[in-house]
């Protein structure tokens, strides 16, 4: 995720802890493009926990998922609400897997593959190395894009997504 000034997001990590000490983790984010929603999103997360999950059996993730969907989406599902539902759903499945001492994929029918592809973004403005040059608007310098792409493939990424649209406030 790019820095906030480039249009990135604010991440929220959800930690659910059961009365038996099991911990489940989930995550969600709100895009900074939604402007000013950071604090209200945090309140939505807290309120959703209180309304739909607090005091409920975490070993019933499907029941709780449908409870959240019915209670949060009403007639219209949106990005923010489904991000919250997804974060709690992930945390609940994490708890179930720990309770039964098995990976979640076993609970969902077994492993489908033994590895997955990972991709990354290349935004219009890139830092070539930890202390290195920052390149703005690589669309004007394709050799920079080629060099960075090769480095990312060497790091293990098998897919690259190029975003030439300026992300910085000053237009790149």
Please place each PLM-identified region on the residue numbering:
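A generic structural signal for short
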Residues: 2, 80-82, 136-138
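Structured core elements
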Residues: 13-15, 25, 159-161
């Amino acid at each position: 995720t790019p820095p906030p000034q480039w249009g990135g997001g604010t991440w929220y990590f959800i930690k659910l802890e059961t009365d038996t000490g099991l911990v489940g983790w989930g995550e969600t984010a709100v895009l900074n493009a939604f402007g000013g929603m950071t604090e209200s999103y945090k309140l939505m997360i807290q309120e959703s926990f209180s309304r739909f999950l607090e005091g409920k059996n975490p070993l019933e993730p499907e029941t709780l998922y449908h409870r959240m969907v019915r209670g949060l989406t009403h007639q219209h599902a949106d990005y923010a609400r489904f991000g919250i539902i997804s974060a709690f759903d992930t945390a609940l499945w994490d708890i179930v897997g720990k309770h039964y001492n098995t990976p979640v994929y076993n609970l969902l029918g077994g492993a489908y593959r033994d590895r997955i592809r990972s991709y990354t973004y290349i935004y219009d403005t890139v830092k070539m190395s930890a202390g290195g040059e920052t390149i703005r608007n690589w669309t004007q310098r394709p050799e920079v894009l080629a060099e960075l792409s090769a480095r990312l493939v060497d790091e293990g990424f098998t897919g690259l997504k190029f975003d030439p649209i300026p992300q910085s406030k000053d237009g790149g």
